[in-house]
UniProtKB/Swiss-Prot annotation:
This is UDP-N-acetylmuramoylalanine--D-glutamate ligase. GO terms for cellular component: cytoplasm. Its EC number is 6.3.2.9. GO terms for molecular function: ATP binding; UDP-N-acetylmuramoylalanine-D-glutamate ligase activity. The gene is murD. It is found in: Cytoplasm. Keywords: ATP-binding, Cell cycle, Cell division, Cell shape, Cell wall biogenesis/degradation, Cytoplasm, Ligase, Nucleotide-binding, Peptidoglycan synthesis.
Length: 532
């Protein structure tokens, strides 16, 4: 906390955007405890901010400007801490603050300035939260006292004072948070400034057309994602998805800076190699046809089984996210805690097993030595992952009644995520979709929806765009319904046989809900009431 006091004590600080997700609240608590003269401003009124305001009652010195922003709160500030949802470009209040000499920060940038912890970071379009959560879980399973923070979890300012060089931190970072870090770096631009964000290990999940109601085009969206690895160097590692068309570009750019690139794929190495480059599998993780995951840690290494097939999360998409997180955790362990006396063959005893026989090429590589994580780490992690069930709102199995199994995938806010949810199940499912449009392409979803046993639509602007596409594809549906309660009551009346019900909206939530988490919580609550 001494560093924080040196940075903030006695300074006039304005927090722009309190919100209700915790980031603004954490920043306010942190700054107040560091001795800042603090103003919190938000365009929403006090009623909309009740949960956050209740927490801040413990800090009576905080001044609030609610329901509006005032220029004087920015012109008189030494530091402005902005919420990621606030657009920085052409914002009159942030411009006024900068003209007056104020620094623009975020909760993430403050954390990166103050924490001595080794950093692992995750970004991409979908799968960020699942991957980051599985990575933190894997690190803890290996004995590291890891923290998890960022986009969909707690602000890292909640735990920054507890971090040390021995406590790895996993940050999940959205495109908006990454864009803010680039802007902060631009303020700090000197010959010695190397960028605040430099994760030892970074994972890029697949890129999809997300937030296109915010960005001018895909290139500007992807440019923000590239901040994830922009300042990595020769001692750092980037995991790229070999099934993603953007993966080769990310890998090429990172390798120019000497970054070590690992590939991961939900396919066999032969299929993935055709999609990328012939040298893709020098360092890589892939999925065998029996559901096991195999890895090669360096060119010439023997392939070794990393993850046995007992994962409980459904579908190859989620399972590949968990496997990539496990690989990242093992790479971190390799760098930080490998005992010198252990033999490192991972599961090399299984390298000639029937699982590997699914591949065209026999495992004729040299047995890995210094490049592979040690056997006890791999075994311990494999055992721990057998009980890993994923996280809330991401294909979350939460209820079963009368032969009906319910999955909450409310964090699915783009059509591609819903398509992936459909493909996660071997059986035909009852699918619930619909919500608020983000200028996405719904044609592929309309075609994929034909695979569903039944389709229910929740009302919204995205649903209005989807309906004519469903008609054109001759896909029948029920709805649209203006509430989850009415939708589920109709579903219960119609559903006479056992089956799987998946709520995977494929759209944003804002016309009916505050955010996707409220949407998912409402769905679970209504299911338990209606199907009791």
């Amino acid at each position: 906390m001494e560093q924080a006091r040196a940075l903030l004590q006695g300074k006039t600080v304005t927090i722009m955007g309190l919100g209700v997700h915790g980031g603004g609240c954490a920043a306010a608590c942190f700054c107040a405890e560091a001795g800042a003269r603090l103003t919190v401003t938000d365009l929403r009124n006090a009623d909309a901010l009740t949960p956050s305001l209740k927490r801040l009652r413990a800090y009576p010195s905080i001044r609030f400007t609610l329901g509006e922003h005032r220029l004087e709160d920015f012109e008189n500030a030494h530091v402005v801490i902005k919420n990621p949802i606030v657009k920085g470009a052409h914002n009159i209040y942030l411009s006024a603050a900068q003209r007056a000499g104020a620094r623009i920060e975020t909760d993430i940038s403050l954390f990166l300035r103050l924490s001595p912890a080794p950093l692992l970071a995750v970004s991409g379009s979908k799968g960020k939260s699942s991957t980051a959560s599985a990575l933190c879980y894997s690190l803890r399973a290996l004995g590291f006292p890891a923290f998890l923070g960022g986009n969909s979890t707690v602000s890292p300012l909640e735990f920054v004072r507890h971090t040390t060089p021995a406590t790895p931190v996993v940050l999940e970072l959205s495109s908006w948070q990454l864009a803010d870090l680039r802007a902060v770096d631009a303020q700090d631009h000197t010959v010695h400034h190397a960028g605040l964000l430099r994760p030892e290990i970074a994972i890029m999940t697949p890129i999809m057309a997300d937030h296109q109601n915010w960005y001018a085009d895909m290139e500007s969206y992807v440019a923000d994602k590239q901040v994830l690895y922009a300042h990595q160097g020769t001692h750092d590692t980037l995991l790229c998805n070999a099934d993603d068309g953007w993966g080769p570009r990310f890998a090429c750019e990172a390798q120019k800076n000497g970054v070590r690139v690992f590939w991961y794929t939900a396919q066999s190495p032969e299929t993935a190699c055709r999609a990328c480059t012939p040298r893709l599998m020098e360092r890589a993780l892939w999925r065998a046809t029996d559901g096991t995951y195999w890895a090669r840690f360096a060119e010439g290494d023997r392939a070794c089984m990393l993850i046995p097939p007992q994962l409980h999360v459904p579908g190859r998409v989620l399972q590949t996210q968990v496997a990539s997180a496990a690989l990242a955790a093992l790479l971190f362990a390799q760098r930080h805690s490998l005992p010198p006396s252990s033999c490192p063959p991972c599961f090399c005893a299984h390298s000639h097993s029937p699982a590997y026989a699914n591949h065209a090429s026999p495992p004729d590589y040299a047995c890995p030595s210094a490049h592979s994580p040690f056997q006890e780490h791999t075994r311990r992690l494999a055992q721990a992952l057998e009980s890993y069930t994923g996280i809330e709102h991401r294909l979350e199995f939460f209820y079963e009644k009368g032969g009906l199994r319910f999955y909450n995938d409310s964090a699915s806010t783009v059509p591609e995520a819903t398509i992936a949810a459909l493909e996660a199940f071997d059986e035909s499912v009852v699918l619930i979709v619909g919500g608020t449009d983000k200028n996405a392409d719904y044609q592929p979803l309309a075609q994929a929806a034909a695979k569903a046993h039944a389709l229910y639509l929740l009302a919204g602007s995205a649903t209005a765009r989807l309906q004519p596409l469903l008609h054109a594809a001759q896909v029948p549906f029920y709805g649209p319904f203006t509430s989850l309660e009415v939708l589920l009551q109709d579903l219960r009346a119609r559903q006479k046989s056992p089956g799987v019900i998946v709520f995977s909206p494929g759209a944003a939530s804002f016309e009916l809900f505050a955010h996707e988490f409220e949407r998912g919580t409402t769905f679970k609550s209504q299911v338990r009431i209606i199907f009791e």
